[in-house]
Amino acid sequence: MLRRAIASLLCVLGLALAAGAAETPIGTFDRVTIAPTKTSIYIGTVALTMPTFVRKNGAYESSYAAKVFPYFFSNEKGALTITLTDESLRKLERGEPVEFSGRAVNTDGEERRIEGKATPEEGAHGLRGKIKVRVFVSKRIELIFNTSYRFGEL
């Protein structure tokens, strides 16, 4: 009887370890690329480009460039930080959407609040999907960008 109990316990333990090993290592989520995106504004557009984000201490960091057409004098560049916990990354890996927040600071020191939602593609284990980003330029101006993301070395 004791042998069966020990064998059952070892079997359950082995399955638990196998399930944990099936998870993608967090290191896979160290870099994320966001596709260039564009949104409409009154009589114009805003194009947003960002190089690959790198994860440091639970936050993704990158720079950004926003080009405003035809109002070129409103173009801006700056730094961008997005906070995403390990648990949120595990949710993405399981195929669950996650919300995130962050901030951007342009070269003039003006801060922009950022909120968004990442929705993974089915069967991609969170490594790619769609992303919706809201940039709060002022109390009354909010820019919404819809694009895609991809984790890993590219």
Predicted regions and their residues:
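N-terminal prepro-regions of secreted/extracellular proteins
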Residues: 5, 20-23
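Bacterial N-terminal signal peptides
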Residues: 8-16
